[in-house]
Amino acid sequence: ASGSQGPVAQAPVALVFCAVPSRSAARYGAKGEQLFCIQDATIACAYAQLAATALGLTSVWIGAVHEPEVVQEALRLDDGLWPVCFLAIGHPAESPERTTRRRLSDLVHELPR
């Protein structure tokens, strides 16, 4: 359901972040149903990934749920819950070498005054 993503099957913990489109639609209309609920789920996943890293764990974000109906059925999700992304979490199998961080000037662009 995650498109042959082995980390989900191998990880000791796999979290599924879901949206509730109807709840967002009730408050924000079509944008809530089609966009805001997905943004909320992905933001929650990003914070969970940061928390895992802070605990010394490693994680893999899988941001495409190719067969949401299969996930809904397999996890017995309530109607209205829409799986948006997965986060596989575990202890690192190895300690990879740290990569060089990009310079702030490569990431931030100032607007002219």
Label the model's feature ranges.
Residues 1-113:
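Acidic, surface-exposed loops and disordered segments
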